A protein has these predicted regions:
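C-terminal boundary and immediately downstream tail of ABC-type ATPase nucleotide-binding domains
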Residues: 156-193
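Conserved ABC ATPase signature
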Residues: 67-71, 75
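Catalytic Walker B motif of ABC-type/P-loop ATPase nucleotide-binding domains
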Residues: 92-95
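Helix N-cap at the start of a conserved alpha-helix in ABC-type nucleotide-binding domains
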Residues: 103-105
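A short, proline-enriched helix->beta-strand linker immediately N-terminal to the Walker B motif
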Residues: 86-90
Length: 193
């Protein structure tokens, strides 16, 4: 693969890093403009308009002038999502998108990733240990243990899976084990959940 091919490939991929990876010395708007400045041939005005559109899409239109140190963790994640979609990528890769966030903010981020995936017609790949995110966002789920694909299926399949490694991971807490037992019993009785 030559440099031009790599450049094309990079334009097609949006990246959402675990720690947001915003540049501290740049405003939120400048952070979102960064991939546009690197890879877009559009005018400065067009790049700024696209960045403002992306910030508006993640409900941060009023935060463009602020620096990462001046915004919350949830706002930083949303700014990172705006940056990840700035080039209108075909693929969005997310590494632990909810790390360090409270449960309520995590749901906001999950919903945003889900909605943007559909709206921008992207394929989104999420690496996470957060089963709430898996159940909120995932359509096709792959469980990897020690670098090996252990299981693949839908979120509906998780509940009834007999894969021991998957069950050990997901149902490690008493609460989740009880929920699974109740749901499996209801499914056996013919009730739809």
């Amino acid at each position: 693969m030559n440099k031009e091919d790599l450049k094309i490939l990079r334009k097609e991929m949006g990246m959402l890093f675990q720690g947001s990876a915003l540049f501290d010395s740049m405003t939120v708007l400048e952070n979102v403009m960064f991939p546009l400045d690197m890879f877009s041939k559009a005018s400065t005005k067009e790049r700024q308009m696209r960045a403002e559109f992306c910030l508006d899409r993640v409900n941060l239109s009023e935060a463009g002038h602020l620096y990462p140190s001046e915004i919350s963790g949830g706002m930083m994640k949303r700014a990172a999502i705006a940056r990840a979609i700035a080039l209108n990528p075909k693929y969005l890769f997310c590494d632990e998108p909810n790390s360090g966030l409270d449960p309520k903010t995590s749901l906001v981020i999950d919903d945003l990733i889900h909605d943007i995936t559909i709206e921008f017609n992207m394929t989104t790949v999420i690496n996470t240990h957060d089963m709430n995110s898996v159940m909120n966002i995932g359509d096709n789920i792959v469980f990897i243990k020690e670098g090996v694909k252990e299981w693949q299926g839908t979120k509906e399949d998780i509940i009834t899976s007999d894969n021991q490694a998957l069950n050990d991971f997901i149902f490690a807490s008493d609460l989740f084990r009880k929920v699974k037992k109740m749901e499996v019993e209801e499914l056996k009785e013919g009730h739809k959940l």
